[in-house]
Amino acid sequence: MKSDIEIAQSVALQPITDIVKKVGIDGDDIELYGKYKAKLSFEKMKAVEANEPGKLLLVTAINPTPAGEGKSTMSIGLADALNQMGKKTMLALREPSLGPVMGIKGGAAGGGYAQVLPMEDINLHFTGDMHAITTANNALSALIDNHLQQGNDLGIDPRRIIWKRVLDLNDRALRQVIVGLGSPVNGVPREDGFDITVASEIMAILCLATDLKDLKKRLADIVVAYTYDRKPVYVRDLKVEGALTLILKDAIKPNLVQTIYGTPALIHGGPFANIAHGCNSVLATSTALRLADYTVTEAGFGADLGAEKFLNIKVPNLPKAPDAIVIVATLRALKMHGGVAKSDLAAENCEAVRLGFANLKRHVENMRQFKVPVVVAINEFVADTEAEIATLKALCEEIKVPVELASVWANGAEGGLALAKTAVRVIDQEAADYKRLYSDEDTLEEKVINIVTQIYGGKAVQFGPKAKTQLKQFAEFGWDKLPVCMAKTQYSFSDNPSLLGAPTDFDITIREFVPKTGAGFIVGLTGDVMTMPGLPKVPAAMAMDVAENGTALGLF
């Protein structure tokens, strides 16, 4: 079979002006970035606000292997299949970060015959959103350092600046740096550091803002530092929220592209789910819901991370909750959770599938807590055997969850038809009655304990010395009513990435909280989760090149 990029480059793309007509978007409603990419205008988003929202399908997954289990690919294939069934459907996905593209992933625009196009553009600079977010973030850093240099009227303690610089690359050498060295004219020396752009609070804000006014308010509410007497300093104190909004005025508009099958797709925003809330923008999802009968969206990593945050953090900002949740599972990942070594995952092992099923079962039970119907999608791989597939289907039947085999990577829309039909049937027969896991009125401590015990299956939560102090401080500042966004490994329900399956007798330690008051949540840091990733021993970048005619090579 051809590689992802070979398949993508063999497709005759339709002009984006033709694609968007399928969902009632005219040429005057979009701002073109070439022939095949566009941004949706504020006027069109405003015009459809009164429309009744369509059905919403959330795609999530079990705890993944390092290669991922194919949520984006499944989302794309499912949307294409729904369209093939005659359902007016849109996709609402995140846009890739260059860091993982150059690092371990090599691309994040789907795969095989379930891709969004033009995949080279989407994986690289796209419409410049990532660069705008990076620039806004680093402009704020520069303005903070300038405030220190110009007299520090706010009394900012340079030792307690919590705002970091960012870069849309994996670069471990920049995790901790010292700025302002050389001479007094170079600024006030202090410790600083870089996060990856998708970990920036500005990325989260862009993805939760409902319009420019809301964007500006959220930017003003960012906490950047503390004063010498330990009081928080906000962006509004620096009076630069207007400038930051100006930098982001185009980046906030959702991007329109197409799938291989011509399904309209809104690709916008890209926060990671292990260090942020892991969902595409509220604007993209809300607009898709008002333009289409069915919207397919996804949340990053496993359901314990992305889906939990989608349901607890994003849904309160949407016109509606999901009508159904699709949990993607692969036999290779289930075997890994069943104790099989990575080198042996290709060998048939039905017993390991049975053991690893505990991971999928917990995710199904967790999603059912939110009172939303669940469907399991088996993402088919070449090495899967009939016996393993039959074993998994039988296990799903035991817990009464609908399950379908999907081969969208190999067969595109046709490979997702059975899943699409089952999803539609479930939505028609079983109405969702969304229930949030916790209340805003719960304390931060109660919210964390709720997530750890109800979603992760943990026994208890340990709060480190710094976290204990912050619980008191944040309550004094009025931040304790915000949702919690857990920063945790994606590979396990616990904070130990090697503890696979469905562990129960474990504690999770919160070492620190990070206020993201502009985004509207508090991040709880667990384990060794890094907000600036490093590159692997053999980065995907080493296989990338460009042909003499400008064609991209090596993306996948």
Curated annotation (Swiss-Prot):
Q: Which Pfam families match?
A: FTHFS (PF01268)
Q: Which domain of life is it from?
A: Bacteria
Task: Provide the top EC class.
Answer: ligase
Where does the chain bind ATP? T65, P66, A67, G68, E69, G70, K71, S72
Q: Enumerate the InterPro entries for this protein.
A: Formate_THF_ligase, Formate_THF_ligase_CS, P-loop_NTPase
Name by which UniProt lists this protein: Formate--tetrahydrofolate ligase 1
Pathway where this protein functions: One-carbon metabolism; tetrahydrofolate interconversion
Which catalytic reaction applies to this protein?
(6S)-5,6,7,8-tetrahydrofolate + formate + ATP = (6R)-10-formyltetrahydrofolate + ADP + phosphate
Q: Gene3D superfamilies of this UniProt entry?
A: Domain 2, N(10)-formyltetrahydrofolate synthetase (3.30.1510.10), Formyltetrahydrofolate synthetase, domain 3 (3.10.410.10), P-loop containing nucleotide triphosphate hydrolases (3.40.50.300)
One of its GO biological process terms is: tetrahydrofolate interconversion
What CDD domains has UniProt attached to this entry? FTHFS
Q: Which family does it belong to?
A: Belongs to the formate--tetrahydrofolate ligase family.
SUPFAM superfamilies per the record? P-loop containing nucleoside triphosphate hydrolases (SSF52540)
Q: What is its EC number?
A: 6.3.4.3
> What GO MF annotations does this protein's record show?
ATP binding; formate-tetrahydrofolate ligase activity
Q: Which UniProt keywords apply?
A: ATP-binding, Ligase, Nucleotide-binding, One-carbon metabolism
